[in-house]
């Protein structure tokens, strides 16, 4: 594995400057990715804004309290009924508001050949997502309001610990309970590729339970692979679209990137950070929810009041939106590190570039998006940046190799010259001793791997 240090930018160079995509993508390819991004961008941004505006409208005005009270009456008007019905209403309204935006984005992607799923399948996925969200959210909300009833002032202390624990548990259970809801997984048949992927993981010192194929082609033409799970649940998952489109060596590089996440413990570290973030978020919620002006605006008496549920949802949405750019920045850094791991593990920068080009074209990516959009929303570096980083890695590797070769040649030359001098000195000494009638001592043997002093 190569240990070449990360290349440093040239003096005066701007490390944040966008690399030139011209050598790797034609004007038509760049234009196609840019056109897709511009076509779906208004709808994607609209979905984000709508997803934030709705909880703010309901949580910072009496409208949310009125909604929770009204739907609670339909189910008995008890505190528990108001909490559960209010939470369900917020989830359903939020999902319903997102549907038009999601449908518009889907229509755009259909025009670009990225969608293989019909509208019926899309609607079924939306219903599955809604059901899964309700199954996860309703018990959590019920537990939360049990804590607020226990102590309207200090509920957030045990809630913070519970949030951290649940984050860790859900991270472990996600590949077992959530992924199968949306995809079918089958073991990759025995063959050269499966053997190569398992050997790659073994060479990297990573144990995986299995190599699975996800039936992503039912929905999309996009290419992807990932490693999911922790410990006994860890497995390599490849999209069937990747296996039918990419070269085997490119598949190995995609998996090598994902193994980088495992090698650097990105999942457990991310889970730990997520757990800490969840605990901090709950603590902040506890402090804000105790502020009387906010409670008055929401039409609630205190945090134990079921009518405070929309306020808590609004504050959580604000915290999530505010932390989004920071989370994206951390994600881009992690992805860049995984790219470097793939290069070190395979040593194949040329094939890495080919793989990045294939992924960008298959996914119709904007290879050089506006920097502000990249900073705010991108979880991965752009294809242009990833290719430039791979070429910089290769250049640094070549330079290091050349320097190492020159150093070895210089050492060997020094050893040879010193050995010749020692030989001449020894012969002269032997000749002098022989002339004096004394036996010549045993000639000193020089280790060819060390310099003669």
Task: Locate each region found by the language model.
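Polar-ligand-bearing catalytic/cofactor-coordination segments
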Residues: 2-301, 321-404, 437-453
């Amino acid at each position: 594995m190569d240990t070449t240090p990360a290349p440093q930018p040239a003096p005066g160079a701007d490390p944040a400057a966008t690399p030139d995509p011209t050598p790797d993508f034609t004007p038509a390819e760049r234009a196609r990715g840019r056109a897709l991004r511009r076509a779906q961008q208004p709808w994607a941004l609209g979905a984000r804004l709508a997803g934030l505006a709705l909880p703010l409208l309901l949580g910072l005005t009496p409208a949310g309290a009125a909604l929770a009270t009204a739907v609670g009456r339909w189910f008995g008007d008890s505190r528990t009924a108001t909490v559960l019905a209010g939470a369900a209403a917020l989830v359903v309204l939020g999902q319903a508001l997102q549907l038009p935006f999601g449908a518009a984005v889907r229509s755009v992607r259909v025009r670009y050949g990225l969608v293989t799923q019909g509208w019926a399948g899309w609607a079924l996925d939306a219903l599955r997502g809604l059901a899964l969200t309700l199954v996860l959210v309703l018990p959590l909300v019920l537990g939360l309001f049990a804590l607020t009833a226990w102590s309207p002032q200090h509920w957030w202390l045990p809630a913070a610990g519970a949030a951290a624990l649940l984050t860790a548990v859900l991270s472990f259970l996600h590949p077992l309970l959530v992924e199968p809801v949306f995809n079918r997984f089958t073991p990759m048949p025995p063959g050269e590729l499966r053997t190569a992927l398992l050997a790659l993981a073994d060479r990297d010192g990573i144990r995986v339970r299995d190599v699975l194929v996800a039936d992503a082609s039912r929905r999309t033409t996009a290419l992807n692979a990932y490693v999911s799970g922790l410990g006994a649940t860890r497995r390599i998952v490849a999209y069937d679209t990747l296996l039918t489109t990419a070269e085997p060596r490119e598949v190995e590089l995609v998996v090598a990137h994902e193994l980088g996440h495992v090698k650097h413990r990105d999942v457990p570290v991310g889970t730990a950070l997520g757990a800490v973030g969840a605990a901090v978020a709950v603590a902040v919620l506890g402090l804000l929810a105790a502020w009387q002006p906010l409670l008055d605006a929401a039409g609630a008496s205190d945090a134990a009041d079921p009518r405070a549920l929309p306020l808590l949802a609004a504050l959580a949405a604000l915290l999530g939106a505010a932390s989004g750019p920071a989370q994206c920045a951390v994600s881009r850094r992690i992805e860049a590190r995984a790219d470097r791991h793939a290069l070190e593990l395979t040593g194949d920068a040329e094939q890495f570039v080919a793989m990045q080009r294939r992924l960008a074209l298959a996914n119709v990516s904007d290879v050089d998006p506006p920097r502000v959009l990249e900073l705010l929303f991108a979880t991965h570096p752009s294809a242009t940046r990833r290719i430039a980083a791979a070429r910089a890695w290769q250049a640094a590797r070549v330079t290091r190799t050349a320097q190492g070769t020159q150093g070895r040649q210089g050492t060997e030359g020094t050893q040879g010259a010193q050995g010749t001098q020692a030989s001449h000195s020894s012969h002269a000494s032997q000749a002098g001793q022989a002339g004096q009638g004394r036996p010549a001592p045993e000639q000193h043997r020089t280790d060819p791997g060390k310099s003669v002093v």
